[in-house]
Amino acid sequence: MSRKSKASNREVASRPQHSQPPPHERPEPVARALLQGWLSWLVPVVIALITCAAFLPTLQNQFVNLDDNDNFLDNPHYRGLAWTHLRWMWTTHQGHYIPLTWMTLGLDYLLWGMNPVGYHLTSLLLHVTNAVVFFFVVRWLLTRALPSPSERGYALAVSAGVAALVFAIHPLRVESVAWVTERRDVLSGLFYLVTILVYLRACEGEERGRRWYWLAVATFVLALLSKSMVVNLPVVLLILDVYPLRRLGGAIGWWSEPARRIYIEKIPFVLLAAGASAIAVMAQSSVHAAASLAQLSLPGRLVVSAYGLGFYLWKMVVPVNLSPLYELPRTMDPVAPPFILSYALVLAITAIVLALRRPVPGLPAAWVAYVVVLLPVLGILQSGPQIAADRYTYLAGLGWASLAGAGLLSTWRRWPPFVLTGLAVVLLSGLGTLSWNQVEVWHDSEKLWTHALAIDPKTSMAQFGLGRVRADQGKPAEAIEHYRQALNIKPDYGAAHYNWGVVLGQQGKPAEAIEHYRLAVQMRPNSADAHNNWGALLGQQGRLADAIEHFQQALRLKPDFAEAHNNWGFALAQQGKRAEAIEHYRHALRLDPDNALAQSNLLNAIQRRDMGKEDSAQSRKGEKTE
């Protein structure tokens, strides 16, 4: 062998020696496996602890008079899990079909009674669980989306953990977690995330894939029974099929045989979503919650939709001045500055997404998923007084949080890890602090509405809510002033007239109270409460026949209205119709077994009836004696 060939051999042999790190810097395979296994469990624990810490003040919060009073404080139907409670839960009530959510609230009642701490604890634990499940979802997605993820055990775990925390402790999550009424958000979110995780598992292999697939269908059913907003999930799964699963589009195409199989496997999800959507529309119609075209025109709905897309993006980046209610403007000016800025932001994001669709394929996936998830609440089917709501971002924020984790992982080798970790700590500390402060806004009704008015003094519902607080505090003059302010902002605010009437009735001013009830019914013809109270005041004036007409109308509008049955019974008793009165008292108690007034009235009516029978018997006996 020549010297040249020997030298060549030496050069070939020497290359691996210079490319490998020193032995003490090379992690052994066993050590690497132990590190990755340790991180797989440590990171979720850290996520859970940080999320709990950020939302800890919620355990001191009370029920608030933003739907909590109607759903819990004044609603005996959910209090338990007996057959009568379950029958009520599994039928459409109060504008939503959420039987599984009601069952968790019924369990809360059995465990805690009416102590709000238990309700808040359950919501918090569900949210913490969602954060942990989302960590596993993101880790799986990053493993598929980015090259050579197996070499980044620590980086992968940290990036997925940061993504989970960006979702979990963002201030936009506070409304869903700290407001008991929104239990449906955190519960449906749990089954939504579990469905995605199980679906990803089903896509991994053929042997047990079908079992995982049908398990995903089953968990989707549970999500739909918790809140209908999850109907977007079939489309989100298709987006995941495109990226990062790469089961659709690209080399596979859109209409090839493998692609058609992808579409076919979505049929059960689509059918379930369609059924849930139909039930949701019927539920909204039953309480007249949907806005008519006369109330909000089609161009106005398009303006609201564009505004919502821009508004939520802005609040994700700058989560300050968050309010429990962003009220729909009385007049919709499409060229007003807030709307113009929203259009510009949406167009700019769309342009960026199109420009970066090849180098950053996760960006269009996140953008399309964001739009799809928000679509039901973007104003096309407007429901409620709000133009936007923080709670609507609970699922819509998942894609952007995943993208944040992907961005961190993709820059891990280009930036020093301690710099990236430091930036993540600063970001998460800021989000956690803002969330802590926002949770305290939801402590009680007074803080809630005072905060809302500080953000926007022209929010009629906030004036109304604060008026109810003052009425409960025994401050009728201040309550009336807030109702007056609410009506100045929104002259057709029937609920403000109703509550004004309640205060006047308590002040012993029946004529003035009746006038406000009349206006309330004129503005809200479906107000059973206004008819009931109007009838009660007429009964006090001795106009029993007129009073009974209002009780009948109240029960036509609200058949399970125990108080109306009690009042009708009382009017009948005054007319001397004790047998009919007793039947109405009993009906009231079947609807509300704890109704103390109906119990007392029933006992008195039975005693009077029995006394009458005794008097009659004594009278007949006397006649026979004579």
Please report, for each region that a protein language model flagged, where it lies by residue.
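Polytopic membrane enzymes that build or remodel cell-surface glycoconjugates and lipids
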Residues: 2-495, 499, 529, 533
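Conserved alpha-helical positions within TPR/SEL1-like repeat arrays
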Residues: 461-471, 495-506, 529-540, 563-570, ...
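Terminal, low-structured helical/coil segments at or just beyond the last alpha-helical repeat
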Residues: 582, 586-587, 594-626
